[in-house]
Swiss-Prot record:
Component of the ubiquinol-cytochrome c reductase complex (complex III or cytochrome b-c1 complex) that is part of the mitochondrial respiratory chain. The b-c1 complex mediates electron transfer from ubiquinol to cytochrome c. Contributes to the generation of a proton gradient across the mitochondrial membrane that is then used for ATP synthesis. This is Cytochrome b. It comes from Acanthophis antarcticus (Common death adder). Heme b b566 binds at residues 89, 188. GO terms for biological process: mitochondrial electron transport, ubiquinol to cytochrome c. GO terms for cellular component: mitochondrial inner membrane; respiratory chain complex III. Belongs to the cytochrome b family. One of its GO terms (molecular function) is metal ion binding. It is found in: Mitochondrion inner membrane. Keywords: Electron transport, Heme, Iron, Membrane, Metal-binding, Mitochondrion, Mitochondrion inner membrane, Respiratory chain, Transmembrane, Transmembrane helix, Transport, Ubiquinone. The keyword Transmembrane helix applies. It is a multi-pass membrane protein. PROSITE patterns: CYTB_CTER, CYTB_NTER.
Length: 372
């Protein structure tokens, strides 16, 4: 009977009764990961990692392989869905102060960096114009590292320019990294279950818990269904919504695209990179745009965990979201006025959030102490 009770308890897994829809994005991300690995496997069967054949093999998958177009579109649109979900997941963590669970937050940041690396390697594989030139620009940033830069770039390229060895190793990395993401996700979930999920109020959830199944599991299934429906709708009616028209042309090292830009989900980091005219400074800013998330648990000063009861912090948070969108938009534009200035101002505001937020928390504490 005790064994049955243990099994029952593990299935019920008590969770705070008031967690909202924002808590469903973890399960949606897991669904995205499963979708990407399964569709990626079928694409890898037909893909050829050779600079002369890669573009043709992608065309072959789309035209000749039964349901190849489904796999290719699901994989491409699924990547965008993955990033939409992860950005919402991170925003939820910032808003509700979930970063105070340090181990979960830091493992999540490592997951984000790994995911971005995986997506970048994947974007290069079709060997279209934008794939080639995005790879050239981004990998060239390694040369900004003093002393080691040139050696690292040559090692990554497998030669003195982006060529066949580069594509081969990018394919190998793109294939292996999702399994690292699975491992990191397992660690992320195990660490989360040490303390358990928090809730929108930021209060101790132990006083009011309900079984995970059926209450929250059905809620998860609903949101996963909404996500998959959206995914298939985009695939059916606008399959090239997130694609760059430039990438429908085969890579040509002799012709530079008018405006080099990565996929939309990297544009905020790329916009920050472009806003700094110095190569090393831009590279550091690019890295810091993601790594700065790791500072959040150590700079939280407010006595209140969630922003739900902090109107000034809410204004600051929504300014960050607007800034993120602004940087993404400016990164799609050419490097010319007024976009340069807008991008620079937005980049300053983006980083300012992580400086102003702890100061604001300290000010709020002072005000609350004065009032009490």
């Amino acid at each position: 009977m005790s064994n049955q009770h243990t099994l029952l308890s593990s299935n019920l897994l008590p969770v705070g009764s008031n967690i909202s829809t924002w808590w469903n994005f973890g399960s949606m991300l897991l669904t995205c990961l499963a979708l990407q690995i399964s569709t990626g496997f079928f694409l890898a069967i037909h893909y050829t990692a050779n600079i002369n054949l890669a573009f043709s093999s992608v065309t072959h998958i789309m035209r000749d392989v039964p349901y190849g177009w489904t796999m290719q579109n699901l994989h491409a649109i699924g990547a965008s869905m993955f990033f939409i979900c992860i950005y919402i997941h991170i925003a939820r963590g910032l808003y509700y102060g979930l970063y105070l669970n340090k181990e979960v937050w830091l493992s999540g940041t490592v997951l984000l960096i790994t995911l971005m690396a995986t997506a970048f390697f994947g974007y290069v594989l079709p060997w279209g114009q934008m794939s080639f030139w995005a790879a050239t620009v981004i990998t060239n940033l390694l040369t900004a590292i003093p002393y080691l830069g040139t050696t690292l770039t040559t090692w990554l390229w497998g030669g003195f320019s982006i060529n066949d060895p580069t594509l081969t190793r990018f394919f190998a990395l793109h294939f292996i990294l999702p399994f690292l993401i699975v491992s990191l996700s397992s660690i992320h979930i195990i660490l989360l279950h040490n303390e358990g999920s928090n809730n929108p109020l930021g209060t101790n959830p132990d006083i009011d818990k309900i079984p995970f199944h059926p209450y929250h599991s059905y809620k998860d299934i609903l949101m996963i269904t909404v996500m998959i429906t959206t995914l298939f709708s985009i695939m059916a009616f606008a399959p090239n919504l997130f694609n760059d028209p430039e990438n429908f042309s085969k890579a040509n090292p002799l012709v530079t695209p008018q405006h080099i830009k990565p996929e939309w989900y990297f544009l905020f980091a790329y916009g920050i990179l472009r806003s700094i005219p110095n190569k090393l400074g831009g590279t550091l800013a690019l890295l810091m745009s993601v790594i700065i998330l790791t500072t959040a648990p150590f700079t939280h000063t407010s006595h209140i965990r969630s922003m739900a009861f902090r109107p000034l912090a809410q204004m600051l948070f929504w300014t960050l979201i607007a800034t993120f969108i602004t940087i993404t938009w400016t990164a799609t534009k050419p490097v010319e006025p007024p976009f340069i200035l807008i991008s620079q101002m937005a980049s300053i505001i983006y980083f300012s959030f992580f400086i102003i937020n702890p100061i604001l928390g300290w000010v709020e504490n002072k005000i609350s102490m004065t009032n009490s």
